[in-house]
Design a protein with these regions (language model features):
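C-terminal non-catalytic regions of proteins with extracellular/luminal or membrane-system context
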Residues: 1-206
Length: 206
């Protein structure tokens, strides 16, 4: 019996290939050119020497793409936090980001346990996964302490989008969550300039 030999995209080689390097460079360019600037009130571009309070659920848990068939396996995801820090920008909100990391990991654990429990009672375990898309938890309220050392605030609104996770006409999905609304109103009442970023694969009503 003859077998047809074929090449596949998977690899066990830990070395980054020339192909990966080219694709990574192309993906970075596509991301840069795909950013849409809706409004700029003499804040952007941010100076690399600036002190920035980086806040919001997508700051260090940046959504890289879709889910389901829209997901891809890649070696590295660079978050907004990592990108800004690598550029030399001083991030002053590490306490807020650390607190959100704890909330995020706790939410992921609860989500995982729920799926594993439901999988025991269905014929196809994948159904338990598909019917329970992960929802990013809210962060703690932004306080005066979080912005006291900042020259600029960058607040990131993120939404998970993709197969099985379309926008819903609810707060925290298509609409801002109550937490996001309160945070933005609080920040707007202060004298520090604000940059609002939307990190989502679908529309969000502001």
């Amino acid at each position: 019996m003859a077998f047809t030999q074929f090449k596949h995209s998977g690899t066990l080689n830990p070395e980054i290939s020339v192909c990966e390097k080219k694709h990574s460079s192309f993906a970075e360019k596509a991301a840069e050119e795909g950013i849409v600037l809706l409004k700029n009130e003499n804040i952007l571009p941010i100076s690399l020497s600036a002190s920035v309070a980086l806040l919001g659920i997508g700051a260090d848990k940046t959504v890289k793409g879709g889910i389901g068939s829209g997901d891809v396996n890649n070696r590295q995801n660079i978050t907004i936090y990592e990108g800004m820090e690598e550029s030399g920008i001083r991030i002053t909100s590490r306490d807020w980001l650390d607190d959100y990391e704890h909330r995020y990991q706790k939410a992921r654990l609860i989500w995982k346990e729920k799926i594993l429990e439901e999988a025991k009672h269905v014929n196809n375990p994948f159904d338990a996964y598909a019917s329970n898309p992960f929802i990013m938890p809210e962060g703690r309220p932004v306080s005066e302490m979080d912005i006291q050392e900042a020259e600029i605030v960058v607040y990131v609104i993120s939404r998970i989008s993709g197969e099985g996770k379309d926008r819903r006409l609810e707060k925290g999905d298509y609409y801002l969550s109550e937490r996001e609304e309160k945070d933005i109103l609080f920040l707007n009442s202060r004298s520090v300039p604000i940059v609002l970023l939307i990190n989502a694969g679908g529309p969000v009503e502001l």
